[in-house]
Structure formats: C-alpha cells, structure tokens
C-alpha cells in the first residue's frame, strides 16, 4: 500500500484510505486452504488439541484483550501451544499499544494458528507525539494514520483484516445460534465467512434500555469516562476540531461504520454471503447493550448499538467481542435488531467475549482461546441467554 506524506483534509479522503487499505490487504494475502475432509475426533480438547490432529473442517477460536505490553501477558502468548491445521483465531482487539509489540504477538499467533484475524481495539490506536508508529511509515500523525500502519503490519504478518471465507467440505456443519440447541445440521457447504467489524463507542450505548436502567441519560461523564482514550489522536475531519485527544466525538463511530460498509461493498470482500454459509463477525467494542455485563460507570465508553446492527445485518450467527474484560457466552434473541435484508437469517445470535485481560483479573484457565465455530452440540447456551 502506498504511504502518504500529508494527512488528507477531508473525511472522504480518510474513508478512501482506510477502506482501500483493508480491501488491498484482502487481495494481497492468498486464499485460505480448503478443509481436507479428514474425520472428526470428538475426543480432542477444545482448548489445546494435538497439533497433529487435522479436523474435517475449519475450527475457529476467539480471544481478545491480550495487552501484551505487559510482560506477564507476553509470556502467556509465548507459551501458547500450536493448534492443528485448519484452525483459525479471531483476535478481537487490544493486542498492544506499540506496533512492534503487536507485530511480535501476531507473528507468534501465526506460528500457532493457520489463519489469524484481527480488528483494532482502542489501545492499538493510542498515539504518542511524533515521530511515532504512524509518521515513521509516512502516514498522518493521528490514530487513523496509526491504523493504516497497523494494516501494513498485519499484511506483513499474514494476518487478515477483511472478510474472508474459510472453505470447508460438503457435509455436516454447525456453529450458529440455531445449532446451539439442535446440534449440527446438514448443509450444502461447510464454508464459514469471518467478518471483522470496525467500530468505536458512542454515548447512545449507555442510553439504551439494557444499560439505561443503570445509567442516567442526563448524567455527566464519570472521571473514568471523561479521559478515556485520551491517548488517541483524531483528525478534525471525524473528531472534534481543536480537541484531537477527545475520543467521545460521535463522528468516530459513524466513520468506522462507513468504513465497514465501503469494504463490504467491494467485490473482493462482499458480504453477506450466499444462503447456507455461516457468518462469524467480531469487533473489539461491545455490539449491543443487552450483552454488556460491566459497570454502569463505564457504559459510555463500552460500545455501540451500531456495531451490532451492522454485524446482524450481514447475517451473523456468532459475534466475538472484547473491551469490557467481562467474559460472556450467550445466545440472544435479536429479532428486533435484524435488518430487513437479513430477515431470512437466524433471529438468534451467539455473543462471546473471551478476554485474556490484565494479570490481576485472571483466574484458572481464563483467557485460553475459546472455540466459537463450529459450536459443540454438548455446550450450553450460557446462563444469561435471552429468548
């Protein structure tokens, strides 16, 4: 991708740059290999299967919030075992703050998983004064410039940042919310499409029904919320003019929604896919207020209903997210959110958060990559499933 010397002055310029970089990245990486058709082995562990085992179809795991700037977390990544062929990992943001650390982590993960998918969290977009990770590559001195530099890093590491089909074999496939109670089902294809959903939080998230009962619509930001992500730096084209370190501008979330729509309209990244293909989406931020299980004191910096609407609009049956460091695995009725174009898709979606988080937050095996597709028929829907 060609670097730029000066920050473009308009929102459309930034939109073209970021969406174009994602589409270009998708074209530069080879297509994933098709599953071999080897027989399944139900005795394999879901957290650390033997690397010599090759499943009949692709398996997809999810994790978020690695925060590998912390030495303890980096050692955790280094200690991860290798997973079998045809195993993919979704990394739902907050790998690290420094690009060099993010690169190291992504390379380590690519050694352990055949395919790795990534979407930026807020920590990746923190930007110190120049020279920094954005400017040394010739990109604008702001968080979107840093995102462009991170897309370059992902391409160099073989990590995917755009919608990608993991091709399976004809036969039994499963993993969507519809399978959670009925088990695997017969399909014409065992393909699965993995779709990164870029996003940012907005104030409206805290005012929706699920969170609003705990959050006053009229209250001011808490101290934690007010300075949240002051490490980011936003161009005036999408942020608040004269306040580049203010991450609360509504234009940030709407910009990323437009990036998604632009990428998904491109022929090389087009979604939704054909009928009968499962769709896995993932974001860093919380996609719906109803699946946010954290404190109301942080609700204004947690997520956006727009993320969930976009994910469900392309037919997602499983959505992986992060950010709040509160793990979840629930199947939720989303019939009130589904876009008309997706009305024939499932009206239920599985939402999974599996955060490594900070060392002080971990207990037991928390943070081990969690299998999110295909879903094992023996797994429960989760204690908080809504219907």
Regions found by a protein language model. Name each.
Residues 128-144, 294-298:
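Short, flexible/disordered intra-domain loops and linkers
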Residues 105, 143-146, 297-306:
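Charged helix-capping and loop-helix junction motifs
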Residues 140-171, 188-230:
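Hydrophobic alpha-helical segments and helix pairs
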Residues 178, 195-281, 285-297:
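Active-site-proximal loop/helix segment associated with metal-binding centers of metalloenzymes
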Residues 67-72, 96-100, 123-134, 162, ...:
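Active-site environment of divalent metal-dependent phosphoester hydrolases
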Residues 53-61, 165-195, 276-278, 331-336, ...:
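Beta-strand-turn-beta hairpins that frame and shape the catalytic cleft
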Residues 54, 293, 298-299, 305-317, ...:
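Binuclear metal-dependent phosphoesterase catalytic core
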Residues 2-119, 124-135:
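N-terminal active-site segment of His-dependent metallophosphoesterases
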């Amino acid at each position: 991708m060609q670097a730029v010397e000066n920050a473009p002055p308009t929102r459309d310029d930034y939109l073209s740059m970021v969406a174009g970089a994602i589409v270009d990245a998708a074209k530069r990486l080879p297509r994933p290999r098709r599953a071999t058709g080897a027989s399944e082995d139900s005795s394999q562990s879901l957290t650390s299967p033997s690397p010599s085992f090759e499943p009949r179809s692709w398996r997809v795991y999810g994790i978020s919030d690695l925060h590998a700037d912390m030495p303890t977390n980096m050692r955790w990544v280094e200690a991860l075992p290798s997973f079998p062929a045809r195993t993919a990992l979704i990394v739902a943001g907050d790998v690290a703050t420094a690009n060099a650390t993010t690169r190291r982590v992504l390379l380590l993960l690519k050694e352990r998983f055949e395919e790795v998918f990534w979407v930026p969290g807020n920590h990746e977009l923190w930007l110190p004064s120049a020279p920094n990770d954005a400017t040394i590559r010739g990109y604008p001195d702001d968080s979107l410039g840093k995102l462009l530099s991170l897309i370059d890093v992902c391409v160099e590491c073989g990590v995917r940042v755009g919608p990608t089909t993991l091709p399976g074999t004809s036969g039994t496939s499963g993993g969507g919310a519809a399978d959670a109670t009925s088990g695997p089902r017969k399909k014409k294809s065992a393909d699965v499409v993995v779709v990164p959903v870029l996003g940012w939080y907005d104030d409206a998230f805290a005012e929706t029904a699920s969170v609003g009962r705990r959050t006053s619509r009229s209250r001011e930001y808490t101290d934690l919320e007010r300075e949240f992500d002051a490490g980011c730096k936003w161009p005036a084209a999408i942020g608040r003019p004269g306040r580049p370190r203010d991450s609360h501008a509504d234009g940030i979330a709407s910009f990323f929604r437009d990036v998604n729509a632009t990428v998904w309209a491109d022929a090389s990244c087009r979604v939704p896919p054909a009928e009968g293909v499962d769709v896995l989406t993932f974001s860093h931020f919380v996609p719906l207020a109803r699946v946010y299980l954290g404190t109301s004191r942080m609700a204004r910096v947690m997520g956006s209903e727009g993320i969930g609407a976009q994910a469900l609009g392309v037919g997602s049956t499983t959505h992986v997210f992060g950010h709040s460091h509160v793990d979840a695995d629930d199947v939720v009725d989303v019939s009130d959110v589904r876009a008309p174009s997706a009305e024939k898709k499932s009206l239920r979606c599985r939402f999974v958060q599996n955060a490594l988080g900070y060392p002080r937050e971990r207990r037991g095996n928390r943070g081990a990559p969690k299998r999110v597709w295909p879903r094992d028929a023996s797994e429960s829907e989760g204690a908080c499933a809504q219907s």
